[in-house]
């Protein structure tokens, strides 16, 4: 049993280590520290920090005969602050011997022991940590005095020690910092189910792992019908299902109107019948003024309208005096004027007036006098003759619109006037009266789609539409609550007879039954058929009999077997056969009885004029999957078709050369079961059935040897719609082959 070293032994070890590292020693040799091999620290779990408790066991150092340590086994002491707490430091140090020799002073000098000890130097920096030394042999020391507990050191690196005695409970410390979240614990055992609590509110749908099956609960009350969920994304196209037999369902309720689809492509301009005149639409907003148009041709002179009321008196500036015109023609004698006022009394006369003298010459026109005062308005004179047309004046201010005049007589068509300059655009006129509906024009091109208008009012309920095609299967919804048990339905109709199944394997032999009672003796049975036994052992030869009488002449015997083959004849000389004509078949070979076949169907004319012998043989492949049911399967891709006896348009092989034929077929199964039959003259001679497994591509094959005569037909056919999963693709081939074994 190892004894833990006390403080004196630890001091001795430390002094031995410090003295062993000094090179200058008077009586002894220096043993250098041999580097130790690298030690692999013990692997400990990462959750438990590596530590070394205080008071750990120091490895034992082997000693020499005189109690000194040997240099090669010098243990490595810990550096830094890892020294254990030593009470009464350097007070209980025992003298250490010097490698087996006492210290001898020099001649004439005596070195006191106290003088060898110098002053305590400053504490050096902790050196690097060395590798751990090899474990020493267990030492046997005297237990020392128990020292005072030292300060808590840094956690060491060592093996965990023996568990210590439980200490006194300390005072409650300050709450530590919140630690990191520990690893997730294992799932504990299922607890005892507690009492059922009140139903809580409906929570949000969570996403969790499926739990174990719970105990069956009591059926709850029937809940309200939930809202209709949005349609799920279209699923992948499933395999072709088997044809079902169901009763037609009731017509469904009319669904909500669908969203307005995008406008279709512009169609070709059609010519349709004129539609019914629609109601006038609401008045649109005022449009922007368009660019001024080109002046049109002058229209015919319109009917003069009724003279409007006189306008307001205008205020114009007086114009300049015009050039005096020529004197007009003398007017006619006017009417007698009114008698004038009596004049003043005249001067007294001188004499009587004389006779009037002769008319003198016309004098020069005098200067026009000043403008006299404006006379009174005379009576309206007779209309004068129309003067020459004056120059067109400036356009006046448009007057107010007068009342519509009566329709006058159409005037004569005037001459086309000179196109005047383009006037400024006039103000927008008032909307006129609605004209008569014009003739319907041709259907114009479809314009670009307009802005989507406001939703119109809800129209009347339409008639029930036709039943639509079944939609794509949606994503399976969440598992709903368990419904109430339904009413048992009526017994369904008996389905059609299914495909005959494959004969199952024979069951194991049952245990022997209990022997029954002894029966009565039966009636004697009819005589049995003559038995066929093995020939018995030949008996011994008897003595030779006496020669009998000569019998009648017998019938000629059967022909004997063919003799041995004769010597080989001279080599035959045959022209080479072109590549596309196949190999030579000399007269189609021998029959089964050794007789040559007839020459009626032995040869056909080849390209070079010689006979081209072909064997009735073919191989055809199917290129389209799922051929129709109840008709010959058309294997339409030919690999070889000798003598053209197979028709890829109908899928039927017609015999030309009588003989024994071999037929084989290879089909694939996908999306449903496969049941094919080999027919000879509309009669099935062989069936092949293969059951489809979801997710797998299976195959089936069959073959038969048939005796055919000229005109016989052979083909493959699907006899049932419930097993029509015959599949073919670009790299998955279903084939049909046949060839002549030997002619008859």
UniProtKB/Swiss-Prot annotation:
Residues 29-117 are annotated as: Nonhelical region (NC2). The keyword Secreted applies. Residues 128-137, 288-298, 389-403, 558-579 have a biased composition (Pro residues). Keywords: Angiogenesis, Basement membrane, Cell adhesion, Collagen, Extracellular matrix, Hydroxylation, Repeat, Secreted, Signal. Residues 168-190, 469-506, 540-556 have a biased composition (Low complexity). Its main location: secreted. Residues 572-744 are annotated as: Nonhelical region (NC1). One of its GO terms (molecular function) is extracellular matrix structural constituent conferring tensile strength. Residues 101-434, 463-584 are annotated as: Disordered. 4 consecutive G-P-P tripeptides are present at the C-terminus of the triple-helical region. These may provide high thermal stability of this region. This is Collagen alpha-1(VIII) chain. It comes from Gallus gallus (Chicken). The lineage of its organism: Eukaryota, Metazoa, Chordata, Craniata, Vertebrata.
